Amino acid sequence: IRSRMLRGETVPYIKEVNLPYLRHFEVDINFSLDYKNGRSELVRELVERAVTAKTGGVEIRTLARDDFFLHLCAHLYKEATTYPWIRMKRDMTLYKYIDLYMLLYETTTSAADEIAARAHALGLGTECYFAVSEAVNLFGDESGAGTRILRGLPDVDTNGLFSVISPEEKKEYRYTERDTVRRFFCADREKLLEEVGVWKP
């Protein structure tokens, strides 16, 4: 429990549902945008901009659309670029990429521009660029929203997108395979990493 709380998420809520192909329904509550419980002022800003959405006749509080999208990007980036998640094979979870793809599919040109601007304003350009480019590489970009967002983030160092940190070892690694599809279908992504130096938080 302590480990999970220090990594910015609660212990999952699990309900047995016994549906075909889905025995358990699991809900994670994430409250951090990076590997530790850092950037609390940023999380506070996202929560303060929360909106009320209606779904199934019920009103729920949720993040504003662009903030929700960026939170998904940051969460995906955190897991994909932190060594322990790669070791546990939780770094490229399919449903996270599908969530992003579906949101991109429904995103208008103006909304894509707003996402890029918001990512830049919040200092989440790298996280957004990484997640969007990976989702587009896996599924395509029928709506053009993914490409639009990427073009709106010209300052991102694309060479740095393939860095992985190991907080416990204080080491930095880099992927030797940059092709998203090849990495996704690799059974042991740890073998695709080469150590490149010391990681300084």
Predicted segment positions?
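Conserved NTP-donor binding/palm subdomain of two-metal-ion nucleotidyltransferases/polymerases, i.e.
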Residues: R2-P201
